[in-house]
UniProtKB/Swiss-Prot annotation:
Gain-of-function mutant plants snc4-1D show a dwarf phenotype, express constitutively the defense marker genes PR1, PR2, and PDF1.2, and display enhanced resistance to Hyaloperonospora arabidopsidis isolate NOCO2. GO terms for biological process: cellular defense response; defense response; glycerol metabolic process; innate immune response; lipid metabolic process. CDD domains: GDPD_SHV3_repeat_1, GDPD_SHV3_repeat_2, STKc_IRAK. In the N-terminal section; belongs to the glycerophosphoryl diester phosphodiesterase family. Glycans are attached at N106, N195, N251, N260, N318, N335, N362, N422, N433, N497, N557, N573, N656. Residues 36-751 are extracellular. This is Protein SUPPRESSOR OF NPR1-1 CONSTITUTIVE 4. Pfam families: GDPD, PK_Tyr_Ser-Thr. Keywords: ATP-binding, Cell membrane, Glycerol metabolism, Glycoprotein, Hydrolase, Immunity, Innate immunity, Kinase, Membrane, Nucleotide-binding, Plant defense, Receptor, Serine/threonine-protein kinase, Signal, Transferase, Transmembrane, Transmembrane helix. InterPro entries: GP_PDE_dom, Kinase-like_dom_sf, PLC-like_Pdiesterase_TIM-brl, Prot_kinase_dom, Protein_kinase_ATP_BS, Ser-Thr/Tyr_kinase_cat_dom, Ser/Thr_kinase_AS. One of its GO terms (cellular component) is mitochondrion.
Length: 1118
């Protein structure tokens, strides 16, 4: 920054604390500030001008909404005519403040400062609790301890301790001096009911403040202020809410008003609508065809502004988590352009309008670097499939990559992982029994490529990677299993036939293991394939990448292909000797993003790392990985915008190439017109690493971290490659060279054979005797071990027969055995579950029983004994007269339970699961929670039973390694079906519990549920019906007719808990201890969960490849 800018900044520091903050912003985040240059491209707006960028509450995507810091930052990083948006609220003494919500608690610390000032008021006909500005004076709201905080909890809370104060409308206008100022009045009628006049405030404010826009969702408000501002007054914009919501002053729905835009034109010059009014989404979050609303508004002479833009919220899957693509779809689609966009991230909106609009795929490139795909366009299709590679080529990749793996029969192919579980649905197929642990590769069991033939691999279904599934972010679910894996030969031909690619990158890992253990020479195979497909001479550059130095040396010695050395570790520096060594065998280097910009707690630290500079000094190009569009992959410094991140690494750091799962985003950046200007606008200047941290209060700073290690010559040194082992030859039958033999040789052979036969017979007799002795001894020792291990009665199989009177009375059947009624010698009636005959030594069964024998809880069925005799196994537990829960909720008994009884049962089951998950010495995950496995005693106290599918795990283990699918269809958690849904853990039981609770609710409302589902020709998803029924209760009606308020509260609480438990992503589900708190807490404390999404479960595959429990009662009598 030049001396004049530094002087100007110092002056700002002396003016006020607010200007101090903004001066730091200017110093730390951006290298310069220049006026944006408007594009001269034609626009399809009403005026023909570029769409307005409207900053909602300033830059509210980073700073607390409506803080002076948010407003000034928006002005610094946006287009010159950015519109500052202020949601106007009135204090009890009539002052207008900028605050985003009628309830102060939603974006301030009012609850902490004024804990006893909560009140209830009717707002649009709904009684609402909160802290309202009409109960506070401006002085009270501007006291030192009162401050603004984030209103959206998923955003960083680091700025909550900065003490940003509430500002008046006049304060924002005079301090910020915005080019355009927009005041939004959301609740005029509410203030009028409390003797506060919003219209009077605005009219008096307009005498000292320049107001350019006034918006409101209330028709009468515009009638009151009509004519009050004169001919040169602000533009009036009518704001539309949800189409089914009622406009409070006309009692008409906004949807009905939308159909009469000529009526709106009588009092407004523009309309503000949610973006879904223009580009609606289907139930799966995909775009539907655009509506004609923009064209209709323009025909009526109305400008149309769109709201709801934010980089860190869910957007249509069509945009591939790229916010720039979303903005462009509203302003540059060839059909229409909105007149403005209301955004929490005005920097991205500014860049979209000014830098990326109206540029085609063939536009001039403003910057040169390599766009290298990662497993093709693997952010949009399953990686390494033909579809992913074709998409990567179409999207503008310069280089496509193939991570080479080897099949057992020596066929090289492209796959993102040597473990097929990570990239396909092999775990759901009959091939899951190929699972092994290879310590040289991973400590986790997997199904490795070298264990399957190429024919078997070709039969597998690929699976899209979902690295942020636990954050609730999925990738293109419609295509999650599309495409087919391709061989290296097919990959090479696909690339060769492309006219746009400049090269290919082939990555090789695990080469040493494959040579030494499997006899597979990957280097030789790859070289042969390259030769066969004509890559010896050609225009495409071939790059060979590996983390193993000697693999690259081997290629160097046998070919002229370029080699790329990948440094796996995150490093903070690199020595000259290490670089000199690398340069001997590599032409380029790959490092990760943190080796360029270190970060801590999702913020760039600003620590100096000169790794990139040092490598480039030795003439080594540096490619950086991994670039992903999902905002959770990026530090907060990049404002949840992948384009900002790419800009920092290309324009800021100067890397030579990006390795990305979303090639389109990186390729589009090359055509960024703003980079070709003499003065680059502020929204395209690279952020300065560590700049955002300087704006955070000391108390909220992340802990200091040790510097990343230095990469030295020793890190490059490796032992020599082992020789390729010879594969075992296939045995063949030989043919004697002659048939004629001397007679004596024939007799000699006869004698040898005779003695050999006799010896074999004697050996077998001795072996049988030893085996019998050993087996008896082993059985005796095993019985002694069992008695010491399990503190339960150990019954013989003969005793089990006597207890059950030779299995006379069947009381239930399950997927793993039959339940009989029996009587012990002391007269106690018991249930005896006899498991189906099993092979093996039964260690899993013994471990399960041993652990369960040490459990004791009111809501867990009590084990009384067991039998383990050879393949005969049985469990003996208490007999419960009322049988299983399903009888009562499915109407198989005359007993009709009320909501209180059902609530107690649901709560009891929750307590039981909480005990299994959080109170046992070793956590037990049940995996088969359903009404049939909940038994009821004579007091209807529930007890969780049937642990046939249970799995034990240490409490510290949050993720379970499983290759089979366990449970009952309808209750199985999505992550049990495929890893693309998330990881299997104790949260899988939470999902099953949620379905159990919802089934209880559905049973109580059976007639209503049947009517709703029958009326939907697409067979309504059951949780969807529950959710809709819950929504209909917001109006005040009970969730079931004929019940009292207490029962209605219990029913609604169960509904909310059930819906939270069945969230598709495990991370969004509460743990069972939290479920118990929710069930026992107040209804008011529960938030409404997101709407459940229908998951299509491949049932046919489940039956083929899973451990499924039959959906039958544990007890059929009682």
């Amino acid at each position: 920054m030049n001396s004049q800018q530094s002087t100007r900044t110092k002056q700002m520091l002396q003016q006020s604390s607010t200007h101090l903050l903004c001066g730091v912003v200017l110093l730390q985040l951006f290298a310069a500030q220049v006026d944006a240059q408007r594009s001269t491209s034609p626009w399809q707006t009403l005026s023909g001008d570029a769409p307005l960028v409207i900053a909602r509450g300033g830059f509210s995507g980073l700073f607390p909404d409506s803080s002076l810091a948010a407003y000034q930052f928006a002005m610094v990083v946006s287009v010159a005519d950015v519109v500052l948006w202020c949601d106007v609220q009135l204090t009890k003494d009539g002052h207008g403040i900028c605050f985003p919500d009628l309830n102060l608690a939603n974006a301030s610390n009012s609850e902490e400062v004024y804990p006893n000032r909560q009140k209830s008021y009717p707002v649009n006909g709904v009684t609402t609790k909160g802290w309202f500005p009409i109960d506070f004076s401006l002085t009270e709201l501007q006291k030192v301890l009162f401050s603004l905080i984030r209103g959206i909890l998923s955003r960083s809370g680091k700025f909550d301790e900065n003490g940003y104060s509430i500002s008046t409308v006049q304060n924002v206008a005079t301090q910020m001096k915005p080019a355009l100022f927009w005041l939004n009045v959301q609740h005029d009628e509410f203030y009028e009911q409390h003797n506060l006049s919003m219209s009077s405030f605005l009219l008096s404010t307009s005498r000292t403040v320049s107001i350019d826009f006034i918006s409101s969702p209330e028709v009468n408000f515009f009638r009151k202020i009509a004519g009050g501002f004169g001919n040169n007054g602000p533009s009036f914009v009518f704001q539309f809410m949800g189409k089914e919501d009622f406009e409070p002053t006309t009692n008409r729905t906004y949807g009905s008003i939308l159909s009469n835009l000529s009526f709106v034109k009588t009092f407004a010059s523009g309309i503000l609508v949610p973006k879904s009014y223009i580009l609606p989404l289907d139930d799966k979050q995909y775009l539907l065809p655009h509506t004609s609303l923009v064209q209709d508004a323009h025909k009526a002479g109305l400008k149309l502004y769109a709201s709801g833009f934010a980089n860190d919220v869910d957007i249509a899957y069509n945009y591939s988590w790229d916010p720039v693509s979303e903005y462009l779809s509203f302003v540059d689609n060839g059909n229409f352009s909105v007149d403005g966009m209301l955004s929490d991230f005005p920097l991205t909106a500014s860049a979209s309008v000014d830098c990326f609009s109206h540029i085609g795929r063939n536009a001039t490139k403003q910057v040169d670097f390599l766009v290298i795909s990662k497993n093709g366009a693997s952010g949009e299709y399953p990686g390494c499939t033909k579809l992913a590679y074709e998409k990567a080529i179409k999207d503008g990749s310069d280089v496509i990559d193939c991570p080479v793996q080897m099949s057992s029969d020596g066929i090289p192919f492209c796959s993102s992982s040597i473990d097929l579980v990570n990239s396909t649905t092999v775990g759901q197929t009959h091939l899951r029994n190929r699972s092994i642990i290879v310590p040289e590769i991973s400590s986790v069991a997997g199904i490795f490529t070298f264990s399957l033939t190429w024919h078997e691999i070709q039969s597998l279904t690929p699976a899209i990677s979902n690295p942020f599934r636990e954050n609730g972010m999925s990738r293109n679910p419609n295509e999650r299993n599309s495409g087919n894996l391709i061989s290296l030969y097919e990959f090479l031909n696909l690339a060769k036939n492309s006219t746009s690619l400049s090269g290919i990158l082939i990555s090789l890992e695990n080469v040493v293991y494959l040579r030494e253990k499997k006899g597979l020479d990957v280097v030789k195979v790859v070289l042969n394939r390259l030769t066969e497909t004509g890559y010896i001479v050609g225009t495409l550059k071939v790059m060979i990448q590996s983390t193993t130095r000697l693999v690259l040396v081997d290629f160097k010695n046998q070919s002229t292909y370029k080699t790329v050395y990948k440094i796996k570790e995150t490093i903070g520096n690199i020595t000259d000797s290490a670089i000199e060594d690398i340069k001997k065998f590599a032409n380029a280097v790959v490092i990760n993003k943190a080796s360029v910009f270190p970060n801590s707690d999702s913020f760039l630290t600003g620590q100096t790392t000169n790794v990139l500079e040092r490598l480039q000094k030795f003439q080594l190009p540096v490619y950086v990985e991994l670039f992903q569009n999902e905002f959770v992959s990026q530090p907060f410094d990049f404002f949840a915008d992948e384009t900002v991140e790419i800009n920092a690494y290309i324009f800021g750091a100067g890397i030579n190439g990006t390795i990305t799962e979303f090639p389109y985003t990186a390729a589009r950046y090359k055509r960024n017109r703003c980079l070709g200007r003499e003065e680059v606008p502020p929204y395209m200047l690279p952020v300065n690493p560590g700049g955002v941290l300087t704006l955070i209060s000391t108390s909220s700073l992340p802990p200091a971290q040790d510097p990343n290690p230095i990469f030295t010559h020793d890190d490059v040194t490796e032992p020599p490659l082992p020789p390729v082992i010879a594969k075992s030859p296939t045995s063949t039958l030989g043919t004697p060279s002659t048939i004629a033999k001397p007679l004596r040789n024939f007799l000699k052979v006869i004698r040898i054979v005779s003695w050999s036969v006799a010896g074999v017979v004697l050996f077998l007799v001795l072996l049988t005797l030893v085996f019998c002795f050993h087996r008896k001894r082993e059985t005796r020792l095993r019985q002694q071990k069992l008695k010491a291990l399990i503190p339960l009665e150990h019954y013989t199989y003969a005793q089990v027969k006597r207890i059950t009177k030779s299995f006379a009375e069947v009381v239930g059947r399950g997927g793993f055995g039959i339940v009989y009624k029996g009587t012990l010698s002391d007269g106690r009636v018991v249930a005896v579950k006899v498991l189906k005959d099993t092979k093996g030594n039964g260690e899993d069964f013994i471990n399960e029983v041993a652990t369960m024998s040490r459990t004791s809880h009111l809501n867990i069925v009590s084990l009384l004994g067991f039998c383990s005799e050879g393949s005969k196994r049985a469990i003996i537990y208490e007999f419960l007269e009322n049988g299983s829960l399903d009888k009562f909720i499915l109407g198989k008994t005359s007993v009709n339970m009320d909501w209180t009884a059902l609530y107690r049962i649901a709560l009891g089951v929750a307590h039981g699961l909480e005990y299994l998950h959080h109170s046992c010495k070793t956590r037990i995950v049940h995996f088969d929670i359903k009404p049939q496995n909940v038994l009821l005693d004579d007091s209807f106290c529930p007890k969780v039973s049937d642990f046939g599918l249970a799995k034990l795990c240490e409490k510290k283990e949050s993720i379970l390694s499983m290759l089979d699918t366990r449970g009952t269809i309808g209750y199985i958690a999505p992550e049990m079906i495929s890893r693309v849904y998330g990881n299997v853990s104790h949260k899988s039981d939470v999902y099953s519990y949620g379905m159990l609770v919802l089934e209880i609710i559905g049973a109580r409302n059976k007639e209503k549920a049947n009517q709703a589902c029958a009326s939907n020709t697409s067979s309504m998803y059951f949780p969807e019906w529950v959710y809709r029924d819950l929504e209909s209760c917001k109006s005040g009606r009970h969730i079931e007719d004929g019940i009292n308020s207490e029962e209605d509260e219990l029913a609604k609480k169960m509904t909310l808990v059930g819906l939270w438990c069945i969230q598709p992503s495990p991370v969004d589900r509460p743990a069972m201890n939290r479920v118990v708190e929710m069930m026992e807490g107040s209804l008011e404390a529960l938030e409404v969960p997101p709407r459940p999404v229908l998951q299509q479960i491949p049932i046919s595959n489940l039956h083929e490849s899973s451990i499924l429990s039959e959906d039958v009662s544990v007890y059929t009598e009682g």
